[in-house]
Amino acid sequence: MSAFPSKAKVVIVGLGGIVGSSVAHHLIENGWDDIVGIDKSGIPTDIGSTAHASDFCYATSHDLLTTWTTMYSMDFYEKMGHYARIGGLEVARVGDDERMGELKRRVDSGKAFGTNVKMISAAEAKEKFPLLEEDQIQGAMWDPDAG
């Protein structure tokens, strides 16, 4: 390892996680050089949000910025060869009207922000995931771009 530099054009504090790594990648992609990254843990780190993430992306959110960022990330990972659009299913059980309402709100927001998400019936959910007990499902949110 070379000596730690005394100066740099850019210093990224917290390089070990997804955010710091993304900042570095995008700076380099846009022609920046002389970049130094530091992290209080090792690189990659296991203490930040990255290590606790689910490793699964749904494009649905209640705000445009989060939806846009997620859709950008999905396209980015796909271009890097590390994303598979396998589809994602979230279900509401019979009797859980609160959950059903939340899924419907997420679908409404997702559609408003340009995603391909939709509500599907219990029968359609079972077609996508045969292990489901159809009589236990009130409905489901289907995101074909999730992965």
Which role fits each region the language model picked out?
Residues 6-7, 14, 31, 52, ...:
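Residue-level preference for short coil/turn positions at secondary-structure junctions
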Residues 143-147:
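Glycine-rich "substrate-gating" loop/helix at the edge of Rossmann-like oxidoreductase active sites
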Residues 28-50:
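Glycine-rich FAD pyrophosphate-binding loop
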Residues 3-19, 36:
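Beta1/beta-strand and adjacent pyrophosphate-binding region of the FAD-binding site
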Residues 5, 30-32, 112-114:
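Short, well-ordered coil/turn elements that cap or connect secondary structure elements
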Residues 12, 47-48, 81-83, 132:
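Short secondary-structure boundary/capping segments within folded domains
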Residues 53-131, 138:
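Dinucleotide-binding Rossmann-like beta1-alpha1 core, especially the glycine-rich loop
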